[in-house]
């Protein structure tokens, strides 16, 4: 019985308390907040190196579970690095006067993009005023009138020359609505006589010789018809000659008219240039030197000159709706020169949020867009700086991962319609000029996603060459405990919460060890710690306290468990009602309490399971009933095979192992996996073979190897606390407890209720290293060891097992002999021939088997 006492663990070894004196404060008030990241030296070095390398592909993938401070740390480090970097250039989109569907991208020094856009807007208004003044003054009108007068004089001279030449040919040129008409002239009496003067005779005027007066007039049709054919032909030829001459003169007039328009246009251009020169010169000088902008301003100048009348119309007609948008500037990406490089955290990385888009406006059912409606994406805004993304969110979005890789590989970003990426019929739209991209991308993700991308995406390693892995725990030292205290202090200041007492901080530190189930480590899942701080503060405020005490932290932890353990309570209720059959008192042969852990989404709990074993004569070996019905996994099956190996090593050195055994996990209706109950099954099997009862108040966990050494398991705290609740439900006897592997001592961070029960000797924890130690605790009988002859003491557990196995083997031989005698009596066997008959030989072979 000495092992029962010797292997008990005292209460102070069941939970590692925080060293409150070493923390050196009474409350977190005035305590320095945590600077940097706690317990992540590997990740810190990796991130620092990744940020220092500016080569292509050296982007960073921060690997770690959620809640370990990845995103917060990334933002802090990126902002720190960005502050020491120069602000990148601004980018603007402007109208392409050569091809409006291809807007031009122009880079400007940081802060100049919006300035240029504002200057362009102001310049448009200034140009309207300047052009209005230039073209409304007398000088322009006088110069224009002079040009028109010169043209008109020249036209008159040309027409006069043509008229005189035609008259010399006895023809007149007459303008009609249909054009010019050539009419022959003749000397003939007037077609109508004017009114007679007083004293004029009826015969008409006569000259001095008494002849009638003749005048030169146009020939009438009837007069032309009276001419001979020869005369008519002559007139036709002359008329044709005059028509040709007229056409020549008209062509000359048109040339002069064209020259007039060109002169007027040149005059207008000259005046326009003079008017706009100061405005554009100022704009150009303000944003120089920039070759691309200079070329665009040249194109803008020419377009202004060509369309100056549009400005005049807008000025002279207030109601006129004139579109001046093509002279505007789209301040696409703007950076503050005092802010350093940009740091962009895109929480919704859908395709258009990353690459930007072209917005459309609905105008009476028609979609309209222009370069002003080009909007930037996260990669545009992060250009020259850093882009932070969440891997899970990124991979959920269609095409986002592909476009990110493409930009990182080619360092250029084009704004494209997603439909075109899918190969749909392209829609007529803008195709903004691509912008060169130079940014460092930092992605935070889980280990699962990191390895998934490594396996299935061959391009992943080319664009994310730096892995920064975050650990979920850190060594528990005085320094790390103090860092947790600093985290609490920083949380109080940042969130405006109540300060914590040193005891409350100590409870938080201890819970951080429980999170990782290791008394020598602390969890780095700061978000879970922050949740406890928030909830503890809420309970303290509800009580009207000014400080958060240890009771508030304990209540917060208890309530957190209560909110999630409904299923655990229901299982315990079934045990109280006797539906789940678990014995926690007395001793039973071939029955033992194993321990399992049920893992829910947000809660895990331990509970006992009744394991039974039956043994009988035979040579089938150990058979697990759950395995036979395929309810067990490969690891559990491996543990079962180790049991057979152990039995053979311990008891079958001098004779064959002849036993049939059946082991079952009673009242289990789901799958069973893991080898943490292999030692428990072995105890149960030994009990059944040796017919030694096992203490039902002691539950067991731990795996075993072929040599009989106990191996560590997981979930030790949940298992102990789970069995404690079952024992407490029916009343603690002071003899109950749990046997655990010695290696699991370092993982013990039991709750205060269990540690108090152990302190009062109402519950016990035994720590063992071998099967022999465990069997002595369970039976109260020495396990036994082989003497110099290789035999066990008959009163020991191993001796009883060996005796039982030898007895079964002997009975088996007697049984076989008896069966052989029944088939072939001894007298008959003596008269047999030397060569047995075929049937008899088969019987002997079967019996031997």
Which functions belong to the PLM regions below?
Residues 2-195, 199-454, 459, 465-477, ...:
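Conserved ASCE/P-loop NTPase catalytic core
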Residues 370, 376-379, 385-398, 402-404, ...:
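Peripheral, non-AAA+ core regions of ATP-driven protein-machinery
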């Amino acid at each position: 019985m000495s092992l029962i006492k010797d292997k008990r663990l005292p209460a102070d070894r069941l939970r590692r308390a925080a060293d409150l004196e070493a923390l050196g404060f009474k409350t977190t008030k005035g305590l320095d907040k945590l600077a940097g990241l706690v317990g992540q030296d590997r990740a810190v070095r990796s991130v620092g190196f990744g940020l220092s390398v500016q080569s292509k592909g050296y982007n960073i993938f921060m690997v770690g579970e959620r809640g370990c401070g990845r995103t917060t740390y990334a933002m802090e480090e990126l902002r720190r690095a960005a502050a020491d970097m120069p602000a990148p250039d601004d980018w603007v989109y402007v109208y392409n006067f050569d091809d409006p569907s291809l807007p031009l991208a122009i880079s400007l020094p940081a802060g100049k993009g919006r300035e240029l856009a504002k200057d362009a807007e102001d310049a448009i208004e200034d140009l309207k005023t300047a052009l209005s003044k230039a073209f409304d003054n007398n000088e322009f009108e006088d110069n224009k009138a002079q040009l028109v007068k010169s043209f008109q004089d020249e036209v008159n001279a040309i027409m006069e020359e043509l008229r005189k030449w035609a008259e010399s040919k006895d023809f007149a040129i007459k303008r009609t609505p249909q054009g010019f008409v050539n009419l022959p002239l003749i000397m003939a009496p007037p077609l109508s006589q004017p009114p007679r003067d007083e004293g004029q005779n009826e015969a008409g005027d006569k000259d001095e010789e008494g002849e009638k007066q003749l005048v030169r007039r146009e020939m009438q049709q009837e007069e032309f018809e009276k001419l001979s054919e020869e005369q008519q032909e002559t007139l036709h030829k002359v008329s044709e000659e005059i028509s040709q001459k007229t056409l020549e003169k008209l062509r000359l007039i048109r040339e002069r008219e064209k020259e007039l328009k060109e002169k007027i246009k040149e005059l207008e251009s000259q005046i326009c240039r003079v008017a706009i020169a100061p405005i554009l010169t100022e704009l150009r000088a303000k944003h120089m030197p920039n070759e691309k902008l200079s070329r665009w301003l040249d194109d803008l100048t020419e377009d202004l000159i060509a369309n100056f009348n549009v400005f005049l119309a807008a000025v002279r007609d207030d109601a006129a709706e004139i579109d001046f948008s093509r002279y505007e500037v789209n301040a696409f990406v703007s950076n503050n020169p005092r802010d350093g490089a940009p740091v962009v955290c895109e929480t919704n990385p859908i395709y258009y949020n990353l690459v930007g888009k072209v917005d459309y406006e609905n105008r009476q059912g028609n979609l309209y867009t222009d370069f002003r409606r080009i909007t930037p994406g996260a990669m545009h805004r992060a250009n020259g700086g850093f882009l932070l993304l969440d891997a899970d969110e990124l991979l959920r979005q269609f095409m986002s991962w592909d476009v990110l890789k493409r930009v990182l590989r080619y360092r250029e970003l084009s704004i494209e319609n997603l439909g075109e990426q899918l190969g749909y019929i392209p829609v007529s739209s803008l195709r903004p000029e691509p912008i060169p991209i130079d940014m460092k991308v930092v992605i935070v993700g889980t280990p699962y996603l990191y390895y998934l991308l490594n396996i299935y995406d061959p391009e992943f390693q080319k664009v994310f060459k730096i892995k920064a892995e975050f650990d979920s725990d850190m060594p528990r030292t005085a320094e790390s405990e103090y860092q947790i205290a600093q985290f609490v202090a920083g949380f109080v200041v940042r969130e405006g919460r109540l300060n914590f007492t040193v005891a409350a901080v100590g409870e938080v530190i201890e819970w951080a060890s429980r999170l990782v189930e290791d008394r020598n480590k602390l969890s780095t899942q700061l978000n879970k710690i922050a949740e406890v701080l928030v909830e503890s503060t809420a309970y303290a405020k509800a009580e009207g306290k000014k400080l958060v005490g240890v009771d508030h932290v304990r209540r917060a932890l208890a309530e957190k468990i209560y909110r999630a353990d409904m299923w655990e309570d229901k299982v315990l209720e079934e045990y109280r009602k006797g539906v789940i059959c678990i014995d926690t008192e007395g001793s039973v042969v071939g029955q033992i309490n194993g321990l399992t852990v049920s893992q829910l989404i947000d809660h895990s709990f331990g509970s006992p399971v009744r394991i039974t074993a039956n043994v009988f004569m035979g040579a089938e070996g150990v058979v697990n009933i759950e395995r036979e019905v395929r309810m067990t996994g490969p690891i559990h099956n491996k543990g079962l095979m180790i049991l057979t190996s152990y039995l053979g090593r311990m008891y079958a050195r001098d004779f064959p192992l002849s036993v049939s055994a059946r082991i079952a996990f009673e009242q289990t209706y789901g799958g069973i996996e893991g080898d943490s109950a292999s030692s428990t099954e072995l105890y149960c099997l030994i009990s059944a073979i040796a017919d030694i009862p096992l203490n039902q108040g002691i539950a067991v966990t731990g795996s075993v190897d072929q040599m009989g050494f106990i191996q560590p398991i997981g979930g030790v705290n949940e298992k102990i606390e789970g069995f404690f609740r079952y024992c407490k439900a029916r009343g603690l006897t002071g003899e109950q407890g749990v046997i655990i592997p010695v290696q699991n001592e370092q993982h013990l961070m039991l709750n205060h209720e269990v540690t108090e029960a152990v302190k009062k000797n109402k519950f016990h924890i035994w720590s063992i290293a071998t099967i022999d130690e465990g069997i002595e605790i369970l039976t109260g009988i020495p396990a036994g060891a082989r003497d110099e002859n290789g035999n066990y003491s008959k009163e020991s557990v191993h001796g009883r097992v060996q005796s039982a196995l030898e007895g079964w083997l002997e009975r088996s031989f007697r049984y076989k002999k008896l069966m052989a005698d029944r088939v072939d009596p001894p007298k008959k066997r003596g008269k047999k021939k030397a060569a047995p008959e075929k049937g008899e030989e088969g019987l002997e072979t079967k019996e031997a088997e």
